[in-house]
Swiss-Prot record:
InterPro entries: Glyas_Bleomycin-R_OHBP_Dase (IPR029068), Glyas_Fos-R_dOase_dom (IPR004360), GlyoxalaseI/FosfomycinResist (IPR050383), VOC (IPR037523), Xdiol_ring_cleave_dOase_1/2 (IPR000486). It catalyses: catechol + O2 = (2Z,4E)-2-hydroxy-6-oxohexa-2,4-dienoate + H(+). The gene is mcpII. This is Metapyrocatechase 2. Its cofactor is Fe(2+). Fe cation binds at residues 170, 227, 278. Gene3D superfamilies: 2,3-Dihydroxybiphenyl 1,2-Dioxygenase, domain 1. It comes from the Bacteria. Residues 25-131, 167-282 form the VOC domain.
């Protein structure tokens, strides 16, 4: 654990028994929102590519992969969350779902019926299907900062390029019970605890090589969608993304700062529905097979190392 990571009040976390089978990636997430035109403007300003289909908006990052779908609905909510697994894990995951008491869904509302669909303990619709690993298999390269003596270290403002996120990094869900959700995603889908802060927030990773968190869970009075995080090259792109969104009229958010759990640089942009999109750079990476020393951190050491004060609306669940 490096000196950037708060550890003075870290309490050891005994590992739970690990299931044999696990997902390896988030394939994509899907939201329902009241107005797709509003969603398209926001996502385009953020630096993502949006394609309209007869059913929804498909959202692509710079890697030209569809990471999200937006459907029209009465209000903003998570439509579903889709995970991918290797073929050799699929049957075992189905058995783990049955053992965990998951409610299977035979006829999901959405077009893709592949894999297995079910509700998690909070009532979120989830899909697991066989697919290629799309989570990184090594730490995403970050640009080196600084310039040698005798050279300029920054381009002029007029030459700053538009920030285009490289890929989806992770998502965070509100849950009435962090421990219950953590137990389910561990026992049913094989996700492993990375770090936590009591029963307030927990971060999980996939065992096949994963960012520090693939799925995060935070305490609320109800289920809900908090944010999706998108990987960018460095802290400059985090700050440039904040400026890019402010210029487009999206001025509310939190950052720029640096997290403790995950260590990533961040800026969160408030979206039109009260949740967030995050620019994220240089997040910790957990290689396949590595035993990560999961910690239980005090509240004051669990959120950020530096940055502006947290706005009140950052922890508001607009779906509660």
């Amino acid at each position: 654990m490096d000196t950037h990571r708060a550890d003075a009040s870290q309490r050891s976390q005994a590992p739970a028994a690990r299931p044999r089978h696990a997902v390896h990636s988030i394939d994509h997430y899907a939201l329902e929102v009241p107005d797709l035109a509003v969603a398209e403007r926001f996502l385009d300003a953020f630096g993502l590519t949006v394609a309209r289909t007869p059913e929804c908006l498909e959202v692509y990052a710079a890697d030209q992969r569809c990471w999200a779908r937006f459907y029209e609905g009465e209000r903003k909510r998570l439509a579903y969350l889709s995970f991918s697994c290797f073929e050799g894990d699929f049957a075992g995951i189905r058995q783990q779902l049955a053992a965990s008491g998951a409610t299977l869904v035979e006829d999901p509302r959405y077009g893709d019926e592949s894999g297995v669909w079910f509700f998690d303990p909070d009532g979120n619709l989830v899909q697991v299907k066989i697919g290629p690993k799309t989570s990184p298999s090594s730490k995403s390269p970050a640009r080196l900062e600084g310039a040698p003596g005798g050279q300029r270290g920054a381009v002029v403002r007029s030459q700053v390029q538009r920030v285009l996120p490289r890929r989806l990094s992770h998502v965070l869900l509100f849950t009435p019970s962090v421990q219950r959700a953590l137990d389910f995603y561990r026992d049913a889908l094989g996700l492993r605890l990375s770090d936590r802060s009591d029963d307030v927030i927990a971060f999980t990773h996939a065992p096949y090589g994963s960012d520090h968190h693939l799925l995060a869970l935070v305490k609320s009075s109800a289920r809900g969608w908090h944010h999706a995080a998108w990987d960018v090259a460095d802290v400059n792109e985090v700050g440039q993304g904040a400026s890019q969104m402010a210029k487009a009229g999206y001025t509310q958010g939190w950052g720029t700062g640096r997290h403790v759990l995950g260590s990533n640089y961040f800026f969160y942009v408030l979206d039109p529905w009260g949740s967030f999109c995050e620019y994220s750079a240089d997040i910790d990476y957990i290689p396949a097979g590595q035993a990560w020393p999961a910690g239980d951190f005090a509240a004051e050491d669990s959120l950020y190392q530096w940055g502006p004060d947290v706005p009140e609306y950052f922890v508001r669940n607009t779906e509660a």
